[in-house]
Amino acid sequence: MISEDLLVEILLRLPVKPLARCLCVCKLWATIIRSRYFINLYQSRSSTRQPYVMFALRDIFTSCRWHFFSSSQPSLVTKATCSANNSSHTPDCVNGLICVEYMSQLWISNPATRKGVLVPQSAPHQKFRKWYMGYDPINYQYKVLFFSKQYLLSPYKLEVFTLEGQGSWKMIEVENIPSPSTRGICIDGVVYYGAQTAHGLRLVRFYVATEKFGDFIEIPVGASNVYDMNFGYSKLVNYQGKLALLAAKSMSMYDLWVLEDAGKQEWSKVSIVLTREMFSYDLVWLGAVGFVAGSDELIVTAHDRFYQIYLVYVDLKMKRSREVWLGGIRCSDRSSLVLTFTDYVESIMLL
């Protein structure tokens, strides 16, 4: 009979789907896999593996369904992992879990296990709602930041849902909560989002572990005067583990502003020009969406004349690219929305 330590080591090497099947082997295996110790250890090892790309497609003019697909590199793509109808808010994907709104309720889903849970309702009748998902890598906790208010000119209130056990809500007692106005991003336990203030648009940081706000981050002058995050001309991205602002000047020209020092609020700028020689001539660009985790590879979405979607990986140093066909997945036209999460890792979180 093998020792428990050796069994744990064997189980840690399994992908999530085979690991989930091991729950049915015997009571001992199920106890080990469901233990907080094993889940934390599995998560810490998963973070060191090569991330996947998770992308979501919404077809605006047909069923308004979000379809989620996961992919490894360089060959993609697996079949859809889950879908959600009539979602009025764009989904979020953090550390292997997806948060999406369906029928005015929040759901958290694990694509690797194909299981999900309904987040207990908080302020269900509030007219204005906004949420972000975050992950605390120190305590291995997933949290949802939920902003709500009844009237347009009213201040937002903020509640935080912690996904642990039965789940719990906590009201954040802060005056003048920064009003969310852009999509957010979670990097190393900090949720960043854009907020309108008396001094214009600023970046807000919320520390997931302590559930406290940090100081505002000023957007670089050269970016704030030209680009508008509210209308999608720029987006927050993870560039080699740092917060960055990817600002579109056109479909082929971008400015990448990288936050080098959050304390000193020092930004660096890189200008990106995508030339036609980098792509097949029969592809129509939809736009850049982010970077492959830990690299200089820019990911650009595109479609061919049959509206089949491609991901194009552009090596900015070598000035070359590789195109990946997504198995015939189609968008209806250029207005179909494609979201890409470039640092997806499988989670053993059993929902």
Swiss-Prot record:
Entry superkingdom: Eukaryota
Signal peptide extent: none
Pfam families attached to this UniProt entry: F-box, FBA_3
F-box domain: residues covered: 1-41
PANTHER family, sorted: BNAA05G37150D PROTEIN-RELATED (PTHR31111), F-BOX ASSOCIATED UBIQUITINATION EFFECTOR FAMILY PROTEIN-RELATED (PTHR31111:SF132)
Protein name (database record): Putative F-box protein At5g52610
